Amino acid sequence: ASDVYKRQASESPAPGGGSISVYMGALGAALGTMVANLSSHKRGWDERWEEFSDWAEKGKAFQIQLMKLVDEDTDSFNKIMDAFSLPKKTEEEKAIRKQAVQEATRFATEVPFKTMQLCYECMSVAKAMAEIGNPNSVTDAGVGALAARAGVVGAFLNVKINASGLDDKAY
């Protein structure tokens, strides 16, 4: 966590808000998973071990999918920057550059859209753990849901700003 914190405070534009939105979703999934794991080992709940283990596996799957998107989001930003750095002296270069910018922008819109979907879906783990999990960990489940929600909202902002650069407005 301290490495992420230090990198975010640097002068580099990436990873930025998109990657942090993904990371927030992953943290939300991690908290839901933690509550599921704690609940599976709660004294007196031995017969519910499998139920909570299933929720923990769902949460872990969301974490893995989201963490893959952290790097994908940074890559999408870098592709846009690379496209904008292409030469634009001749008409042919301008056309190639414009197409590259549009393709990179489309990709940079798809990544946060996937982030929105996964962050929203991972809230199901936090919700279930708030309802059926260890009552001593209900606040952890709540913070997990809030983190995942922040991921959804942050990703939405990135979809909105990235989509504004697309010529194909129907996309």
Please give the residue ranges for each predicted region.
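Short, small-residue-biased leader/transition segments that mark boundaries at the very start
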Residues: 1-5
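Conserved phosphate/anionic-ligand binding catalytic regions in large, soluble enzymes, centered on
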Residues: 10-33, 136-155
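A structural-propensity feature for long, helix-poor, extended segments
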Residues: 43-85
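Glycine/charged-rich beta-loop-alpha catalytic/anionic-binding loops adjacent to active sites
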Residues: 6-8, 12, 129-132
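Amphipathic alpha-helical interface segments
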Residues: 73, 77-146, 150, 162
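Disorder-to-helix initiation segments
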Residues: 9-20, 44-55, 59-62, 94-101, ...
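Transmembrane signal-anchor/signal-peptide helices with a preference for the extracytoplasmic
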Residues: 34-46
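Long amphipathic all-alpha helical oligomerization modules
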Residues: 153-171
